[in-house]
Amino acid sequence: MALETLQIEHVPSDHHVYAALFRDVQNVDFLQAQLIGKNPEFEYAFIDASVIISRTHLFAAIFRALNTLTEGTLQTPNVHSDIVIGLSPTNNISESYRRYGLTPSKTRDVLVIKIVYPKLSSENSTITSEQQPTPESIWQHLTTHIQGTPVPLTNEELAKSTDWAKVRKYYKLNGVPGVERIDKADEEGRRKEMEGLVISGIALRGL
């Protein structure tokens, strides 16, 4: 099973984060339609993997969204869409969806994030763990509905998807002193340098 349980520090113990990476997804239009239609069975963060440079980059957006969830300050209808907009260095929500979410005919590789946490039922009582989705049920749902190849969520696999031109454009790194001097032949070195710049952009959003 390629669904990974992510360990993120300073997250409440009853909040669980699951993630998977699918390559060459053939039904991005279907997945986007479920999001637009607000299908509750598809309450995930679907992210275009081409704009992600590392696990740390992804973790930064997840951590920010979990903070807004626990503080009751979500900017969007749910924590999953807050993860998507949390990748952006700007406060433009619609632009964030376009750039970091799914785009039929353009998105090939898809990152999926699922947050499972205690919710209140209509009777204002906490949903029990038996009623919450399990890693197994999440994985079964994803593999049933995503027409793509699951691969491990590693920096090496993410590097195969990263579109550096997009990253530089979206995070306004073109022309930034030092960026042009990054050795493009040193993939690991470039990832580390760019990672710091990108995460700084995310952290400074809204300040």
From Swiss-Prot:
This is EKC/KEOPS complex subunit cgi121. The keyword NAD does not apply. One of its GO terms (cellular component) is chromosome, telomeric region. Component of the EKC/KEOPS complex that is required for the formation of a threonylcarbamoyl group on adenosine at position 37 (t(6)A37) in tRNAs that read codons beginning with adenine. The complex is probably involved in the transfer of the threonylcarbamoyl moiety of threonylcarbamoyl-AMP (TC-AMP) to the N6 group of A37. Cgi121 acts as an allosteric effector that regulates the t(6)A activity of the complex. The EKC/KEOPS complex also promotes both telomere uncapping and telomere elongation. The complex is required for efficient recruitment of transcriptional coactivators. SUPFAM superfamilies: PF0523-like. It holds the Pfam family CGI-121. GO terms for biological process: tRNA threonylcarbamoyladenosine modification. Belongs to the CGI121/TPRKB family. Keywords: Activator, Chromosome, Nucleus, Telomere, Transcription, Transcription regulation, tRNA processing. Component of the EKC/KEOPS complex composed of at least bud32, cgi121, gon7, kae1 and pcc1; the whole complex dimerizes. It comes from Neurospora crassa (strain ATCC 24698 / 74-OR23-1A / CBS 708.71 / DSM 1257 / FGSC 987). The keyword Transmembrane does not apply. It is found in: Nucleus; Chromosome, Telomere.
